[in-house]
Amino acid sequence: MSKKRLYEIAKEVGVESKVIVAKAQELGLSVKSHSSSVEEADANRITSSLKAGTAKDESKPAPKATPTPKEEKVEPKVDKASVAKSAPAKETSKAEVKEASVALKKPKSRNFKAEREARAKAEAERRKNGGGRDNRNRNQQGNDQGKRHNNDRRNQKGNGQGDHNKGNRDNSTNHDRNFQGKLRNDQNQNNRRDNARNNQAGPRIDLKARAAALKAEQNAEYSRQSETRFREEKAAEQRRAKEQEKARKEKQQAEVAVQKAAAETKPAPKPAPVAPQSAPTAQVQDTRRKKVRPNKSRDNHRVNEDGPKQTRNNKWNNQNQVRNQRNSNWNKNKNKKGKNNRGNSAPKLVTERKFHELPKEFEYTEGMTVAEIAKRIKREPAEIVKKLFMMGVMATQNQSLDGDTIELLMVDYGIEATKKEEVDNADIERFFVDEDYLNKDAMVERAPVVTIMGHVDHGKTTLLDTLRNSRVATGEAGGITQHIGAYQIEEGGKKITFLDTPGHAAFTSMRARGASVTDITVLIVAADDGVMPQTIEAINHSKAAGVPIIVAINKIDKPDANPERVIGELAEHGVISTAWGGDSEFVEISAKFGQNIEELLETILLVAEVEELKADPTVRAIGTVIEARLDKGKGAVATLLVQQGTLNVQDPIVVGNTFGRVRAMTNDLGRRIKTAGPSAPVSITGLNEAPMAGDHFAVYEDEKAARAAGEERAKRALMKQRQQTHRVSLDNLFDTLKAGEMKTVNVIIKADVQGSVEALAASLLKIDVEGVRVNVVHSAVGAINESDITLAEASDAVVIGFNVRPTPQARQQAETDEVEIRLHSIIYKVIEEIEDAMKGMLDPEFEEKIIGEAVIRETFKVSKVGTIGGFMVTNGKITRDSSARVIRDGVVIFDGKLASLKHYKDDVKEVGNAQEGGLTIENYNDIKVDDVIEAYIMEEIKR
């Protein structure tokens, strides 16, 4: 019998796959997911049980008719509660009336302001009860008074009141009536109309009178409190005076008692009350009285006196006298400070220092200075410095303290210290981590983001080409996708966002970036090639990102296609099909002929439904940069993937280390749009610089905050780059010395997009040629310009253009300066070319090659020549230009060059195997019988 998948049964019955899986498990079938297979009989059982369940539900009566009596019972409870609540409300209102009546009692002390406001209130009541006639007369009088022009401010105020029908003051003192006539008649007519309207509307609430009464009550209460306070202070002062007087009297009595006791205890022989002593005291008093200067009589001739005193009495009639008084030396010494002029300056009052209580809590930040802490806790910096010194910390008032020291200091003061959590406005990552940023009630279903991964030329771009009905693959050089493309298609009313990642080994970072923002990975494997290195790498990226994998076995139309082999190879790497009991879906397709494409899309939507992908479109947009480039007309263009929120045109945005405002926004079809929701890929313009691919972006509340955050991020990135200094240590000393001996190939990289720049620079730095390394002097996005040529000339570098061309001026300058420009469109050709250039820069490397061995049979000593060794070749051959080693008992005794080589008496170039001959060695004569002569040459190694 044939088998059926559960999702096929769900499609036939018209229910969700989850319901079918639950029903199958309820019937005792061993199924795991919607893609599990069951027999035809089991499928019929599932459908019949579902139909029976729906029939039972229809046969049951509607259970929603019963709750009505419950609602009727609830109503009287609500009424009782409201009645119960109304009773205390009435009681409280009575209590409020009593309190108000107590508060309205006339104060004991007379408050003129309160009386005046009470009179205003009574006047307002009388005017309200009097009707329109008196009011009209008063308005008439106010108009007459209001139109009189006088310089008095009170008349100006009355004029304003008359214009607004509020002239209620008696301006009877004004008798000027210049402005009368038509204007006054019109105003009177308006007043009559207003009075008639007031009479029709009935009595109005006079808010001014009510405010005046309330103010009067407040003033009365304040005056009553002031009077009570004054009386209490006066009584306290009297008590203090009485206590002081009592203490003074007690002190005097105590002194008198002490004197009496002293007089009683002492005997009489003491000298008498000493008249001679009293006499000198009287003389001293007389002399002092004589020294007091007598009162001088007023000088009658002072009028004729000349000098500053005379001018002071005359109050200085002219300006010259004032200037002379200021510049004269008459009173110059009066303002001097010194021993003789102490009485001239009044004593300064010493203000007592106020005592401030310590706070109970102290919120600190890392790096606070001593002065800041002293200001916060209301203490002197010297006191804190002293405490720190006692704790063993030497600090000044301008020195910053770390968090631990601040906490210890606060413990010494008995204050609870807490570290202030500062929100970093420049931190974009907090939007992706903070769960409170999203509103869970506003979550909606979003489109899945699908990344297509696989090895080079396995059909990724062809699959996207088939999905979008476009010819993307024809534009790629060598059939290789150079940078990420983001596209969105619609299937069955639902949207799917696709990311196309490059498959070449150089684009590892770009594949990892694609896996980090994706929801589902479609791993495309060619049925004829099988699993390749980049296929394994894509599997690892997907597993690291924790996203489900759907395997698309492509090129099944080829005759040598073997899908079963692909399934087995993937199982070895942990990707197991659901048919084998795994979690990964396998779909056999042919991207070229469009075979089973619909089935692949349905599988993607099913997996997305199981994943329950949701987003909040109400918040400010956040997401990731897919790609960035520089356009000649538009400037920096960035391809963004919105992950949460909604991105709008004119939004202030921070992207990586740059910022700007969304000037224009286009979708994947090149059409201009104004908004982009979650999972939508868009290209925007308006940034200051081209960001890095993989950077996060976030929309801020205003442009000022976005500018501050962008500038702060750029500054931090620059500081981080400056701090990356490589210092020499014992561990890397040898590597540093070795790097100094290495030769370098300087290159300047210019590419069309940022992702290609990163991939190309990383690939060139990874080229492993011993003795030579690549130094990337500069890398950027855009065309090759004159500044690049100037930099290449200064640094002796090669300019590499990837999918870009030099400007005419740059080309002409390169020819003049003899700077080499290499233009490429396929990355592995660039790598091969640079690798060959690096190999050509190396010094020739030689390898030792042993060509023969000989054994010394006899030695001959010649006085002028030295020791001649007669030998026999045992292996290989001995040549005249070869080097020779003398080996004795397995140990190398000497290594040098042959001086001569003879066969019998003839000089020869070489002696072959099993032949005899004679030789001499340069600068060595200690040749002995049975020594082994090893001949070798140095050959150059090709790299």
From Swiss-Prot:
Q: Say yes or no: keyword Protease present.
A: no
Q: Which HAMAP family would you find in this protein's record?
A: IF_2_B
Q: What is the lineage of its organism?
A: Bacteria, Bacillati, Bacillota, Bacilli, Lactobacillales
Where does the record place the region G2? 479-483
Q: Which InterPro entries match?
A: EF-G-like_DII (IPR053905), IF2_II (IPR044145), IF2_N (IPR006847), P-loop_NTPase (IPR027417), Small_GTP-bd (IPR005225), T_Tr_GTP-bd_dom (IPR000795), TF_IF2_bacterial-like (IPR000178), TIF_IF2 (IPR015760)
What is the protein named? Translation initiation factor IF-2
Q: Which organism is it from?
A: Streptococcus thermophilus (strain ATCC BAA-491 / LMD-9)
What gene name is listed for this protein?
infB
The answer to whether keyword Protein biosynthesis applies is: yes
Region annotated G3, chain positions: 500-503
Where does the record place the region G4?
Answer: 554-557
